[in-house]
Amino acid sequence: LGYKQVGSDFPVFLHPDTKEEYALARTERKSGKGHKGFAIDSNQSVSLEDDLKRRDLTINAIARTDNGDLIDPYKGKEDIANRVLRKVSHAFEEDPLRVLRVARLASQLKYLGFSIEEETLKTMKSISQSEELKTLPKERIWQETYKALEGRNPEVYFKELIESEAIYKLVEGNFYFNLKVLEKISSEILEPEQRWAALITNSDCDLDDINRAFGVPKKIQVLCYILGKLIQFNLNLKNAEIKNHEILDLIEELDGLRRNKRFIKILKILDAYNNSVLQLKGTFIPWEALSKQLLSIKPSSSTLKDKEIAEDIRLQRLKIIHQELKRNG
C-alpha cells in the first residue's frame, strides 16, 4: 500500500500521499528503566480500548469512528468540559517523561482554565521520588521545557515541576526560581530562548548546573552568560561611576559588535527586565543605540596602518560613549 513506518519502535505509519500519521492499536509493557524501557505489542488482538488505557491523560484517550461517534471509555470529554488534566490508569507512572509532559500541558492550557487533578499530581510526586526521572535523556527534558517556554504561561510549567517535586531530581544542589520574573517578562518577550535566559539569570542558582540539568543548547547558555554580565553591570551603576572604557571593554568582551544581532536580542531581555524588575534610575546606558553607533565607526584616515587603525577606532568609540552618557546622564 506504500505506507512507511516512522522509526522502528512504534507502529506508526505515514500515508504515501497525504503523509498523515496512522497508528496501529498498541500496548506497552514495562521492561526496563526510564522513558524507553518498554516492550511494544501491536498484534491484531490488541483492541482500541487496550490502546486508550495506556494513554497518559483522559483528554488524550478519546477516539472517533468513521461516522463521527466518540469512543471515550475514560470520560475524557467530561474532563475537557471540567478543565481537568487527569491520568488514565496506573500505566501513567511507568513513564517518567509524563511528569514533564503534564506540567507542560498545564502551562499550555492554563489560559483555558485547565489544572492538574489531585490524584494525578500525587502520582507525579511518586514518580519524582523514585530514580526514574534521572534516566530521562537531556534532549527530551529540554524539548518539553522549550515547548512550555513557547506558551502563554511558561511559569506554570516550572511551578508544577516544583509542586510535583520533579525539579529536585532534575537539578542537584540548592536553587531558587523567581517565577514572578518569568511571568512578568513573558508578557513582553515571546522567544523561548529569551524567556529561559531571563528566568535563570534572575534565579538563585548556578547557571552551569541548571543549564546542564535541562539539557540547554550551548548557544542559549551563552545568552544566559551575557545577560548576567549586563544585569550585574547595570546594578553596579547605582554604586559606582562607570568609566567610558569599562563600557567599551564590556561590549567587546561580550562580542557585542561582531555578534551584534545576538547582542540586540539580549538587550531586548535587559529592557524587559529593567522595566519589570530592576526599574533602575539614574545613569542610563542606551546599549542598543550605542552598539549600532560603535559598529558604524570607520578609520578616520586611509593612511593609518595595523595597530594605528585599531587605536583610532577605539578612540572614536570612546568619544561616542562619552557623548551618549553625557546626553543620557
Regions found by a protein language model. Name each.
Residues 1-329:
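Catalytic cores of the polymerase beta-like nucleotidyltransferase superfamily
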